[in-house]
């Protein structure tokens, strides 16, 4: 049986929205609400919050200790190194990458991707629901064997490969066997629905969703969110002008497998 380790990377020093992981969602921090959702999934194995050695992230370690969660501290800016070292420290054979800025992630989506990985009979090196994306932005799940992560950790040289952990892998389809888990409904909301957090408007959106759904149903899922947005279009509009904005926009000249249709600039960048 493979030792599966899910690594959630979190730090307080966000450049666009400082301390976003400690913002309040229904009486707990955003990080806690997000990790609670990850832990609702059936197949996540050992869950580790990987924060940095920066003193300001002592608070993240304290939160993890209070909740009885695993915490690893590593490189502040080389996320590939931090991810690899965390997986190594917990004896991982299979490594799952879930970012900490997706507090609306659906545990059922996490399980769907992990079941694809665990039930594969053919060789694979990387399975995600991101390449290409079809799910609402903010349901990011990536899985790779430890030897593949080790190859990336050893060989990746570009700054964006170190910062974003997995581009070295999915940018090399000629070398690695890549598989993608699409939304079974046949929809593509990857550029139209934004459930991640980088800007104050994202926080307003996520806070509104939590306040509407969490008190009655802490295990609310993707369909619950979509039904809420249909009934309350004013919530959907809160961060709509950022829909489709992601880190790809700053690296289109470097990324071979990403097209301009898979990203957009913010209004002030256009």
What residue ranges belong to the model's regions?
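Conserved donor-nucleotide/metal-binding helix-loop-beta segment in metal-dependent transferases, i.e.
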Residues: 90, 106-134
């Amino acid at each position: 049986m493979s030792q599966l380790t899910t690594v959630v990377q979190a730090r307080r020093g966000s450049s666009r929205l400082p301390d976003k992981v400690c913002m309040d969602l229904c009486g707990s921090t955003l990080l806690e609400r997000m990790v609670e959702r990850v832990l609702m999934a059936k197949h996540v194995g050992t869950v580790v919050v990987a924060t940095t050695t920066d003193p300001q992230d002592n608070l993240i370690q304290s939160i993890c200790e209070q909740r009885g969660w695993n915490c690893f501290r590593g490189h502040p800016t080389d996320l590939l190194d931090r991810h690899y070292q965390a997986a190594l420290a917990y004896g991982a054979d299979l490594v799952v990458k879930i970012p900490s800025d997706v507090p609306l992630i659906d545990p059922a989506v996490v399980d769907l991707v992990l079941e694809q990985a665990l039930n594969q009979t053919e060789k694979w090196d990387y399975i995600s629901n991101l390449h290409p994306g079809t799910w609402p932005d903010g349901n990011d799940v990536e899985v790779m064997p430890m030897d593949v992560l080790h190859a990336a950790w050893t060989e990746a040289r570009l700054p964006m490969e170190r910062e974003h952990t997995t581009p070295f892998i999915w940018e090399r389809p000629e070398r690695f066997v890549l598989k993608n888990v699409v939304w079974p409904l046949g929809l593509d909301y990857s550029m139209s629905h934004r459930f991640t957090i980088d800007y104050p408007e994202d926080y307003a959106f996520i806070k509104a969703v939590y306040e509407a759904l969490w008190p009655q149903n802490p295990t609310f899922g993707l369909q619950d969110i979509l039904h809420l947005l249909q009934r309350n279009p004013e919530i959907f509009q809160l961060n709509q002008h950022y829909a489709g904005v992601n880190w790809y926009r700053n690296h289109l000249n470097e990324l071979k497998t990403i097209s301009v249709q898979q990203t957009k600039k913010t209004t002030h960048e256009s």
